[in-house]
Design a protein with these regions (language model features):
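Membrane-water interface regions at transmembrane-helix termini and the short interhelical loops
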Residues: 4-8, 74-79, 153-154, 204-205
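Periplasmic/ER-lumenal interhelical loops and adjacent helix-loop junctions
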Residues: 82-191, 230-233
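Juxtamembrane/interfacial segments around transmembrane helices
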Residues: 47-53, 71-72, 93-98, 115, ...
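Short, well-ordered loop/turn and helix-capping segments at boundaries between secondary-structure elements
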Residues: 72-76, 101, 176-180, 198-202
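Membrane-interfacial segments
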Residues: 35, 74-78, 108, 112, ...
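Transmembrane alpha-helices and membrane-interface helical segments
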Residues: 25-33, 65-73, 149-153, 193-213
Length: 233
């Protein structure tokens, strides 16, 4: 993780793009502990730290944590009570940080200029360049091998859903638009997916037995025709 180009680059240029990462990892670990002792205090504490350190990225971080939480619910075959506890934790985070976040959300809600300049049709058109995943000033900084592993994950029941979520997030500008607080659709917000992408790569490699078929091959090579900097693959 610490060797990713995006982490080095953002720490040098704009640390606010990655300064929430330690707390994001701690919040994810707190989710693991929740399914052991059923205490969600850690989720509230580290979630509040994310908001206080980088409120602009907190929405995206909470979406990532929600995805991971649902994955853990599926593993433990329990949904209703854990999801209710997560809702309580998120409400607790909002209440603890309200004095800081409510004025900010009010200002963002009034920023109609940025929203109106983004056309809905542009948000619905998929982008196959993978600039949010591969080496890019504002991407996750992975190599093309990670994309191959994500595609392979589609062909295993255990990893299919997470691969699908990652692929849709990387291809659909609307996801970036929502995670950026409805301001713009820049791909730098996808940096928050780094923990999930690393997890997915590990899950795929854990049981790496695949038969290459035509659909898999097409998905693997498709982005190569849209990447503007092929020497970075």
């Amino acid at each position: 993780f610490v060797l990713l180009s995006s982490i080095f680059f953002q720490f040098h240029k704009q640390v606010m793009f990655v300064n929430y990462m330690p707390f994001l990892f701690l919040m994810l670990r707190s989710i693991d502990h929740y399914f052991i002792d059923h205490h969600f205090t850690g989720i509230i504490i580290w979630g509040s730290c994310i908001v206080l350190h980088s409120y602009f990225y907190c929405i995206a971080c909470f979406i990532v944590c929600f995805i991971y939480f649902v994955m853990q619910c599926a593993n433990h075959k329990e949904y209703k009570k854990p999801l209710f506890h997560l809702l309580i934790a998120y409400v607790g985070i909002v209440l603890l940080t309200a004095i800081y976040t409510i004025p900010t959300l009010y200002v963002i809600a009034g920023g109609s200029k940025s929203v109106s300049s983004t056309h809905l049709l542009d948000l619905l058109m998929p982008t196959f360049s993978l600039k949010g995943l591969l080496y890019n000033n504002y991407g996750c900084g992975f190599t093309y091998l990670i994309w191959i592993l994500i595609v392979c994950g589609l062909y295993k029941k255990k990893t299919r859903l997470l691969s699908l979520i990652i692929i849709i997030s990387m291809f659909c500008p609307l996801i970036c638009f929502i995670m950026n607080g409805f301001l713009y659709a820049r791909s730098k917000i996808l940096i928050v997916f780094i923990p999930l992408i690393i997890l997915q790569a590990g899950l795929v490699l854990e049981d790496f037995t695949f038969r290459i078929n035509y659909s898999m091959l097409i998905l693997i090579i498709l982005p190569l025709f849209f990447i503007t900097q092929p020497y970075l693959v």
